[in-house]
Amino acid sequence: MSEPSTIPWTLRRARPSDAEAFARMMQEHEVFRQLLQLPFPDAELWRTRLSSQNAPTSPELHLVAEVQGEVIASAGLHPAATQLRRRHVMALGMSVAVPWQRRGVGSALMTELCNYADNWLGVLRIELGVYADNLPAQALYRKFGFELEGRQRAYALRDGEYVDSLMMARLHPHPPRWAPAAPTAA
């Protein structure tokens, strides 16, 4: 493959057939160490997960960035909770293969996910967790209106050390409004 900055990527919905590509990307130490993933990912588990996300009634959207048929990044929105009173909230997750980090792929994925949440799902709140030492990811999220809401100390074990996680969220910048019809004469 050529130099990453010279090849355009395309975005599309993730498919169950991407499972092997997800497993390969998640084998990259610098990728999975920034997520809650474990080493040695299983392609069949990814296939099952991607199949459920593509169900016609699922509000989830899982996108991939692809170059010459190879998945180089993924990002998705999924319900943050099962409680009905939190159905206005989606959680966001993202991973980008190391050679493609800091090349605009994350921004392209974020643009599409925010558009989907804002204009097609009516999501009021998108939330995420990011490790406190992942400064490039934090900068990307801030660029899209995410704000720091809190810190979870010793949140996860990573490479033999406990690391903190920052909770960030973005509220819909212009929530949809409803203009009720004028009352009719009875």
Task: Label the model's feature ranges.
Residues R125-V130, R142, E147-V163:
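Conserved catalytic-core motifs of GNAT/GCN5-like acyltransferases
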Residues W9, P16, L35-P99, Y116, ...:
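Acetyl-CoA-dependent GNAT
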Residues A21, A91, R125, P136, ...:
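Amphipathic alpha-helical recognition patches that constitute DNA-binding helices
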Residues M110, D118-G129:
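Conserved GNAT acetyl-CoA-binding A-motif
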Residues T10-R24:
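A short beta-loop-alpha structural element at the N-terminal edge
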Residues S2-E3, M94, E161-A186:
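Terminal substrate-recognition subdomain of acyl/acetyltransferases
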Residues R102-A117, Q138-K143:
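Conserved acetyl-CoA-binding loop-helix of GNAT-fold acetyltransferases
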Residues F22-M26, E30, W46, L50:
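Hydrophobic alpha-helical core bundles mediating ligand binding, dimerization, or RNAP-core interactions
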